[in-house]
Amino acid sequence: MNAVILIPARLDSSRLPKKMLADLDGEPLIVRTWRQALLSNHAVRVVVATDSPEIAGALEAYGAEVMMTSPHARCGTERIAEAARSIDADVFLNLQGDEPLIDPRNIDLCLEPFLADNPPDCSTLVYPLLPEDFQQIDDPNVVKVVLDRNGNALYFSRSPVPFQREVYAATQFYRHIGLYAFSAEVLQHYASLPPSMLEKAESLEQLRLLENGFSIRCVTTTVDHPGVNTPEDLDLVRRMLRRSAGR
């Protein structure tokens, strides 16, 4: 397997403007994400795809490989698909730029289905939620996923799925961890498709795959980490970094 990690990064964010350049213990957030990606054992290359000269400059100051992409990408997967057209690889992993604490073991876990004889169209990670995690289950910023018996995604939603008529304890909920591995062919096919109805309704780009008949293999991980979507998330990550540094 010849796998390349592509990190899409844009400057504008409705919930947390310029979050990619937010300071995390002296480094931009996007640099932290790039450094974690370099620790993967399965990937041979890490590239950041951006349309922002400001983000590119911040990364290049640390020696990161950057590809400039069109400002017209409608989502991160379209952005990495553009970059992937000039890279020779079998598999591309889309790592969100706002994951500065991503564990490299999760990156490798997401890529492992592509080591099998019959690889999926796409793979991603899910983290099991407990009944006491009801705040996450109800939080629209936390994406939930329901699986079939073979571990393939049936649906992703910002709503609590599956709906419970009685109590949350009656079923298993999973939180989606937003990194994806694609075959090179499926990635380009994805980018050629228009945004789908459910994708636009939920604002979840992975639904474009499901609506068009592609499978998404979901691998369960026990290694959790917070992404950065809101100011509260950013404060949490800063506190975690201070604790890990003994401050």
From Swiss-Prot:
Compartment(s): Cytoplasm
Pfam families, per the entry: CTP_transf_3 (PF02348)
Protein name per the record: 3-deoxy-manno-octulosonate cytidylyltransferase
HAMAP family: KdsB
A single BP term in Gene Ontology: CMP-keto-3-deoxy-D-manno-octulosonic acid biosynthetic process
Matches recorded under InterPro entries: Cytidylyl_trans (IPR003329), KdsB (IPR004528), Nucleotide-diphossugar_trans (IPR029044)
Family stated for the protein in its record: Belongs to the KdsB family.
Species this chain originates from: Chlorobium limicola (strain DSM 245 / NBRC 103803 / 6330)
Entry GO MF terms: 3-deoxy-manno-octulosonate cytidylyltransferase activity
Pathway named in the protein's UniProt entry: Nucleotide-sugar biosynthesis; CMP-3-deoxy-D-manno-octulosonate biosynthesis; CMP-3-deoxy-D-manno-octulosonate from 3-deoxy-D-manno-octulosonate and CTP: step 1/1; Bacterial outer membrane biogenesis; lipopolysaccharide biosynthesis
Function: Activates KDO (a required 8-carbon sugar) for incorporation into bacterial lipopolysaccharide in Gram-negative bacteria.
Keyword Cytoplasm: yes
Record-linked SUPFAM superfamilies: Nucleotide-diphospho-sugar transferases
Catalytic activity field: 3-deoxy-alpha-D-manno-oct-2-ulosonate + CTP = CMP-3-deoxy-beta-D-manno-octulosonate + diphosphate
Enzyme Commission code: 2.7.7.38
Keyword Methyltransferase tagged: no
A GO cellular component entry from the record: cytosol
Assigned keywords, A-Z: Cytoplasm, Lipopolysaccharide biosynthesis, Nucleotidyltransferase, Transferase
